[in-house]
Amino acid sequence: MLTNKRLQNFVIHASDGDLGYVHELYFDDETWTIRYLNIDTGGWLGGRRVLISPFSIIRTAWDALRLDVALTKKQVEDSPDIDTHRPVSRQHEAAYLGYFGFPYYWGGPFLWGTAYYPSGVAVSDASSAETLADRVGRESADSHLRSTGAVTGYHIEAADGEIGHVDGFVVDDETWAIRYIEVDTRKWLPGKKVLVPPAWIEGVSWTDSKVRVGLSREAVKEAPEYDEFVPMTREYENRLYLHYGRPPYWLHDAEPASPYALSGV
């Protein structure tokens, strides 16, 4: 498990050198899975920000705070230029994925289309598939991508009132699913942080910056405290799910992904 805060210290290393460091993450708001890492390339690309898909990640070097990717610097330099300061459309995603020969993650029943893990998806020769123009033309404009930076600070509302705000995200570095939202309750419960799985979200108002969860404030108050500086253990996760009386995610990990109820305005 990794937090988005820790990932922001990671360097992205290509086969022929460093690409830059992680600036923030993009996730889709239907399955709450990280789809891209927004990379600050520093000076070698004139300050250009580029996107890196988990499809390309081959190793996590924990001690070195580094993610190794199966790409070259030239590939990244020649990749479609996406303005990361504006919403990323599905057409932009299709152009990006097509350039690298990656499949569409939205084209199957699992988190990564035909596979549960991005590492289990084969890279294809884009030239052997249908033309990019045809592929892009069939895609909708909205890709449901949100950045961790933009959603941090959203208010969290329980069934009976506000309980805190989004302070971070805990990410599974194998599936790249967001396992937990880190909730800072210090304005209501001084000094305490707790975790809430995205599956328990009942709705999000993107215009009002609010996340509604199907929990009571009392349930959150009595939940096991979360310490972001202590490594996540299965024992802690078990205590969390036992407290809430809900089945853990690992009991249905291999099942086809079904979008969480995240309708909002």
What does each of the following model-derived ranges do?
Residues 1-265:
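Peripheral interaction segments used for macromolecular assembly
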